[in-house]
Amino acid sequence: MDRTPVDLVPALKDAYLRKVAFTKGCETVELTFHVLRRALGSREREQDRVAGFRFRGVRGLATEALRWDRDAAKWVQAKVDWLGALARDQMERPIVNGASVGLDVTLERWRKAAESALWLRGQPANLDPEVQGIVAVAPVIFELTAEVILPSGINANARLFLAADGLDVVGSKGPRDLGALLREGEDWTAKWRDYWRRRERRPELPEDPQFEWMQPTEDDLR
């Protein structure tokens, strides 16, 4: 299956997963992000940071949450439906670590986690192209990793796998595309780096909250 691989880290890293919504049976899934890596223009407002991902014709949806077991000294499955808890507004907003569309390695990771993951739609057999591979041949393969605080108050590393027939991206002003999101993320990174270089030379300059929230390392400013 030919898919265009897109690494969404430049756009979605550090974003908040603000909202989750899905139909009964999860045929349609909507994820709403509050994007921090976007430099707002003078006429833009905070609502312009919103990016909605709407997945149509969902073939498979699975999640996992790994917590650190101090007694066993290893990561173990928390066995919690964190996505459902978020949809019911029962937990704090996850912070995105990574996201991608169309990466072959996503299917590899999904297969490794298939038996222990919580399947909200589909089943592990759907990952096998020689059996019931409706997931393996899906036009859209999406993966998300995030830091979460579970309803119990425990910190965990969460992952979401999703296979669908289509993906629509929507912003505050209407339809968007992944390329535009990536360009905005790359533009923010360039402006963030320039901002901190100026601040390094002239500490008296006023702070800009669009960039101040993330402190740079020495390597970032080289």
What are these regions (language model features)?
Residues M1-R222:
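Surface-exposed, interaction-prone regions used to assemble/regulate multi-protein complexes
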